[in-house]
Amino acid sequence: MRLIADSGSTKTHWVLLNGEQELHCVTEGLNPWMADRGVFALVGRQLCGQLGLEGARVEQVFFYGAGCGTESACQRVREWIGETLPFDSMEVNSDLLGACRATCGSREGMVGILGTGSNMCYYNGQRVALQRVSTGFILGDEGSGNHIGKRLLKDYLEERMPEDLRAMFHDDYPYTTAEFIDCIYRRPFPNRFLASLASFAASHKENQYMQEVIHSCSRAYFEQMTYFGEHASLPLHVVGGLVSSFEAEIGEAAAGSGVRLGVMVQSPIEGLVSFHKE
Protein backbone atom coordinates (compact mmCIF):
# COMPACT_ATOMS: atom_id res chain seq x y z
CA MET A 1 0.00 0.00 0.00
CA ARG A 2 1.12 3.52 -0.84
CA LEU A 3 -0.36 6.69 0.63
CA ILE A 4 -0.07 10.09 -1.10
CA ALA A 5 -0.99 13.36 0.60
CA ASP A 6 -1.28 16.94 -0.63
CA SER A 7 -1.62 19.12 2.45
CA GLY A 8 -2.30 22.84 2.51
CA SER A 9 -2.94 24.95 5.58
CA THR A 10 -6.70 24.40 5.29
CA LYS A 11 -7.20 20.82 4.07
CA THR A 12 -5.31 17.65 3.17
CA HIS A 13 -6.24 15.41 0.23
CA TRP A 14 -5.19 11.78 0.72
CA VAL A 15 -5.08 8.97 -1.83
CA LEU A 16 -4.44 5.35 -0.86
CA LEU A 17 -3.09 3.12 -3.65
CA ASN A 18 -3.73 -0.54 -2.86
CA GLY A 19 -3.17 -2.67 -5.94
CA GLU A 20 -5.66 -1.43 -8.53
CA GLN A 21 -7.77 0.21 -5.83
CA GLU A 22 -7.60 3.99 -5.36
CA LEU A 23 -9.28 5.47 -2.29
CA HIS A 24 -9.63 9.21 -1.63
CA CYS A 25 -10.43 11.21 1.49
CA VAL A 26 -10.08 14.80 2.71
CA THR A 27 -9.10 15.90 6.22
CA GLU A 28 -8.00 19.05 8.01
CA GLY A 29 -4.81 20.74 6.84
CA LEU A 30 -1.54 19.65 8.47
CA ASN A 31 0.87 22.56 8.33
CA PRO A 32 3.47 21.66 11.01
CA TRP A 33 3.90 25.35 11.88
CA MET A 34 0.18 25.82 12.56
CA ALA A 35 -1.13 22.38 13.65
CA ASP A 36 0.20 20.68 16.78
CA ARG A 37 0.72 17.03 17.70
CA GLY A 38 -2.91 16.75 18.87
CA VAL A 39 -4.27 17.85 15.50
CA PHE A 40 -2.01 15.36 13.72
CA ALA A 41 -3.22 12.59 16.04
CA LEU A 42 -6.88 13.46 15.40
CA VAL A 43 -6.36 13.52 11.63
CA GLY A 44 -4.43 10.25 11.81
CA ARG A 45 -7.36 8.54 13.53
CA GLN A 46 -9.83 10.02 11.03
CA LEU A 47 -7.63 8.85 8.18
CA CYS A 48 -7.39 5.29 9.49
CA GLY A 49 -11.17 5.18 9.89
CA GLN A 50 -12.03 6.61 6.48
CA LEU A 51 -9.51 4.50 4.55
CA GLY A 52 -9.87 1.32 6.61
CA LEU A 53 -6.28 1.39 7.85
CA GLU A 54 -6.87 0.34 11.48
CA GLY A 55 -4.17 -2.18 12.35
CA ALA A 56 -2.60 -1.90 8.90
CA ARG A 57 0.93 -0.85 8.00
CA VAL A 58 1.51 1.38 4.96
CA GLU A 59 4.59 0.54 2.90
CA GLN A 60 5.26 4.04 1.52
CA VAL A 61 3.93 7.48 2.41
CA PHE A 62 4.53 10.49 0.15
CA PHE A 63 3.54 13.67 1.99
CA TYR A 64 3.64 17.08 0.28
CA GLY A 65 2.76 19.87 2.66
CA ALA A 66 2.58 23.59 3.30
CA GLY A 67 5.15 24.50 5.95
CA CYS A 68 7.41 21.55 5.05
CA GLY A 69 10.30 23.63 3.76
CA THR A 70 12.77 22.74 6.52
CA GLU A 71 14.10 19.41 7.77
CA SER A 72 12.88 20.12 11.30
CA ALA A 73 9.32 20.62 10.03
CA CYS A 74 9.54 17.47 7.89
CA GLN A 75 10.78 15.50 10.90
CA ARG A 76 7.80 16.65 12.97
CA VAL A 77 5.44 15.46 10.23
CA ARG A 78 7.13 12.04 10.06
CA GLU A 79 7.09 11.67 13.83
CA TRP A 80 3.54 12.86 14.43
CA ILE A 81 1.97 10.87 11.59
CA GLY A 82 3.91 7.78 12.63
CA GLU A 83 2.31 7.90 16.08
CA THR A 84 -1.10 6.92 14.66
CA LEU A 85 -0.25 5.46 11.24
CA PRO A 86 2.60 2.91 11.09
CA PHE A 87 4.65 2.99 7.88
CA ASP A 88 7.80 1.41 6.44
CA SER A 89 9.08 4.57 4.74
CA MET A 90 7.92 8.16 4.49
CA GLU A 91 9.04 10.94 2.18
CA VAL A 92 8.05 14.44 3.30
CA ASN A 93 8.43 17.32 0.86
CA SER A 94 7.10 20.83 0.45
CA ASP A 95 3.76 21.45 -1.21
CA LEU A 96 5.74 23.40 -3.80
CA LEU A 97 7.65 20.29 -4.92
CA GLY A 98 4.31 18.50 -5.03
CA ALA A 99 2.93 21.17 -7.35
CA CYS A 100 6.06 20.84 -9.52
CA ARG A 101 5.79 17.07 -9.84
CA ALA A 102 2.06 17.28 -10.50
CA THR A 103 2.31 19.85 -13.31
CA CYS A 104 5.78 19.34 -14.79
CA GLY A 105 6.68 15.73 -14.04
CA SER A 106 10.33 15.54 -15.12
CA ARG A 107 10.27 18.70 -17.29
CA GLU A 108 11.55 22.11 -16.21
CA GLY A 109 9.14 24.94 -15.56
CA MET A 110 8.01 27.79 -13.37
CA VAL A 111 5.48 26.64 -10.79
CA GLY A 112 3.32 28.56 -8.33
CA ILE A 113 0.76 27.95 -5.61
CA LEU A 114 -2.26 30.17 -5.03
CA GLY A 115 -4.34 28.84 -2.15
CA THR A 116 -4.63 29.79 1.51
CA GLY A 117 -1.02 30.91 1.08
CA SER A 118 1.17 31.36 -1.99
CA ASN A 119 4.57 30.39 -3.32
CA MET A 120 6.58 30.31 -6.55
CA CYS A 121 9.71 28.57 -7.82
CA TYR A 122 11.81 27.43 -10.77
CA TYR A 123 11.81 23.63 -11.12
CA ASN A 124 14.61 22.05 -13.15
CA GLY A 125 12.80 18.77 -13.74
CA GLN A 126 14.14 17.09 -10.61
CA ARG A 127 14.08 19.58 -7.76
CA VAL A 128 13.12 23.10 -6.78
CA ALA A 129 16.25 24.85 -8.06
CA LEU A 130 15.36 28.47 -7.28
CA GLN A 131 12.82 29.84 -4.84
CA ARG A 132 12.14 33.11 -3.09
CA VAL A 133 12.16 33.05 0.69
CA SER A 134 8.67 32.24 1.95
CA THR A 135 7.80 34.76 4.66
CA GLY A 136 4.36 33.43 5.57
CA PHE A 137 0.94 34.98 5.88
CA ILE A 138 1.99 38.06 7.86
CA LEU A 139 4.87 39.28 5.67
CA GLY A 140 4.22 37.48 2.39
CA ASP A 141 1.74 35.16 0.65
CA GLU A 142 1.09 37.70 -2.10
CA GLY A 143 -1.95 36.90 -4.22
CA SER A 144 -3.20 34.22 -1.85
CA GLY A 145 -6.57 33.78 -0.20
CA ASN A 146 -5.33 35.28 3.04
CA HIS A 147 -3.83 38.25 1.12
CA ILE A 148 -7.23 38.96 -0.45
CA GLY A 149 -8.96 38.41 2.90
CA LYS A 150 -6.51 40.70 4.68
CA ARG A 151 -7.13 43.46 2.13
CA LEU A 152 -10.92 43.10 2.44
CA LEU A 153 -10.91 43.10 6.22
CA LYS A 154 -8.60 46.11 6.42
CA ASP A 155 -10.79 48.07 3.99
CA TYR A 156 -13.92 47.02 5.89
CA LEU A 157 -12.60 48.03 9.30
CA GLU A 158 -11.17 51.31 7.99
CA GLU A 159 -14.45 52.04 6.15
CA ARG A 160 -12.81 52.15 2.71
CA MET A 161 -15.02 49.40 1.30
CA PRO A 162 -18.01 50.71 -0.72
CA GLU A 163 -21.11 51.04 1.47
CA ASP A 164 -23.22 48.46 -0.40
CA LEU A 165 -20.49 45.84 -0.14
CA ARG A 166 -19.75 46.83 3.45
CA ALA A 167 -23.36 46.11 4.40
CA MET A 168 -23.24 42.70 2.70
CA PHE A 169 -19.88 41.92 4.31
CA HIS A 170 -21.39 42.70 7.71
CA ASP A 171 -24.34 40.40 6.96
CA ASP A 172 -21.93 37.55 6.16
CA TYR A 173 -19.52 38.32 9.01
CA PRO A 174 -21.49 40.06 11.80
CA TYR A 175 -18.48 40.56 14.07
CA THR A 176 -17.43 43.59 16.04
CA THR A 177 -14.03 45.13 15.42
CA ALA A 178 -12.81 43.55 18.67
CA GLU A 179 -14.02 40.12 17.53
CA PHE A 180 -12.22 40.45 14.20
CA ILE A 181 -9.03 41.44 16.01
CA ASP A 182 -9.45 38.44 18.31
CA CYS A 183 -9.76 36.12 15.30
CA ILE A 184 -6.49 37.44 13.88
CA TYR A 185 -4.32 37.86 16.96
CA ARG A 186 -5.61 35.44 19.60
CA ARG A 187 -7.40 32.47 18.04
CA PRO A 188 -5.74 29.50 16.28
CA PHE A 189 -5.22 29.47 12.50
CA PRO A 190 -5.57 33.19 11.67
CA ASN A 191 -4.33 32.41 8.14
CA ARG A 192 -7.32 30.16 7.54
CA PHE A 193 -9.69 32.80 8.88
CA LEU A 194 -8.29 35.47 6.58
CA ALA A 195 -8.37 33.10 3.60
CA SER A 196 -12.00 32.25 4.32
CA LEU A 197 -12.89 35.91 3.67
CA ALA A 198 -11.77 35.48 0.04
CA SER A 199 -15.03 33.62 -0.59
CA PHE A 200 -16.76 36.99 -0.22
CA ALA A 201 -14.59 38.35 -3.01
CA ALA A 202 -15.50 35.36 -5.18
CA SER A 203 -19.22 35.93 -4.57
CA HIS A 204 -19.00 39.60 -5.61
CA LYS A 205 -16.16 39.56 -8.11
CA GLU A 206 -18.19 41.39 -10.79
CA ASN A 207 -18.14 44.48 -8.57
CA GLN A 208 -15.62 47.11 -9.72
CA TYR A 209 -14.08 47.51 -6.26
CA MET A 210 -13.70 43.75 -5.92
CA GLN A 211 -12.10 43.50 -9.35
CA GLU A 212 -9.52 46.07 -8.24
CA VAL A 213 -8.78 44.10 -5.05
CA ILE A 214 -8.37 40.78 -6.88
CA HIS A 215 -6.23 42.28 -9.66
CA SER A 216 -4.08 44.22 -7.19
CA CYS A 217 -3.34 41.10 -5.13
CA SER A 218 -2.71 39.03 -8.27
CA ARG A 219 -0.33 41.63 -9.71
CA ALA A 220 1.63 41.60 -6.44
CA TYR A 221 2.02 37.85 -6.91
CA PHE A 222 3.23 38.07 -10.51
CA GLU A 223 5.70 40.85 -9.66
CA GLN A 224 7.74 38.12 -7.96
CA MET A 225 8.58 36.64 -11.38
CA THR A 226 11.32 39.24 -11.83
CA TYR A 227 13.33 37.42 -9.14
CA PHE A 228 13.79 34.43 -11.45
CA GLY A 229 15.70 36.19 -14.24
CA GLU A 230 15.87 34.21 -17.49
CA HIS A 231 13.58 31.52 -16.07
CA ALA A 232 10.74 34.07 -15.93
CA SER A 233 10.22 33.58 -19.67
CA LEU A 234 8.98 30.03 -19.03
CA PRO A 235 5.23 29.43 -18.65
CA LEU A 236 4.07 29.54 -15.04
CA HIS A 237 1.99 26.54 -13.94
CA VAL A 238 -0.38 27.43 -11.10
CA VAL A 239 -1.94 25.11 -8.52
CA GLY A 240 -4.38 26.00 -5.76
CA GLY A 241 -7.91 26.73 -4.68
CA LEU A 242 -7.94 30.28 -6.08
CA VAL A 243 -7.67 28.85 -9.60
CA SER A 244 -11.31 27.75 -9.51
CA SER A 245 -12.55 31.01 -7.96
CA PHE A 246 -10.50 33.59 -9.88
CA GLU A 247 -9.17 31.90 -13.02
CA ALA A 248 -10.18 34.77 -15.34
CA GLU A 249 -8.85 37.45 -13.01
CA ILE A 250 -5.56 35.59 -12.49
CA GLY A 251 -5.22 35.25 -16.27
CA GLU A 252 -5.84 38.96 -16.83
CA ALA A 253 -3.34 39.98 -14.14
CA ALA A 254 -0.75 37.59 -15.59
CA ALA A 255 -1.20 38.99 -19.10
CA GLY A 256 -0.92 42.53 -17.76
CA SER A 257 2.30 41.56 -16.00
CA GLY A 258 3.79 39.90 -19.08
CA VAL A 259 3.58 36.42 -17.54
CA ARG A 260 2.69 33.37 -19.66
CA LEU A 261 0.51 30.87 -17.85
CA GLY A 262 0.73 27.12 -18.38
CA VAL A 263 -1.30 24.44 -16.60
CA MET A 264 -3.81 25.75 -14.04
CA VAL A 265 -5.39 23.22 -11.68
CA GLN A 266 -7.19 23.53 -8.37
CA SER A 267 -5.58 20.44 -6.84
CA PRO A 268 -2.31 18.66 -7.66
CA ILE A 269 -3.43 15.31 -6.27
CA GLU A 270 -4.29 13.63 -9.59
CA GLY A 271 -0.95 14.72 -11.04
CA LEU A 272 0.84 13.37 -7.97
CA VAL A 273 -0.95 10.03 -8.25
CA SER A 274 0.15 9.79 -11.89
CA PHE A 275 3.72 10.77 -10.94
CA HIS A 276 4.01 8.07 -8.29
CA LYS A 277 2.39 5.42 -10.47
CA GLU A 278 5.10 5.82 -13.12
Task: Show which residues each predicted segment covers.
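Short, acidic/small-residue loops that bind anionic groups at enzyme active sites
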Residues: 86-95, 140, 261-264
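Acidic-glycine-rich active-site phosphate/pyrophosphate-binding loop
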Residues: 15, 75, 118-131, 246-255
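Short beta-strand-loop/turn "lid" adjacent to the catalytic site in phosphate-handling enzymes
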Residues: 49-91, 103-104, 183-187
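Conserved phosphate-binding catalytic cores of ATP/NTP-utilizing and phosphoryl-transfer enzymes
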Residues: 88-112
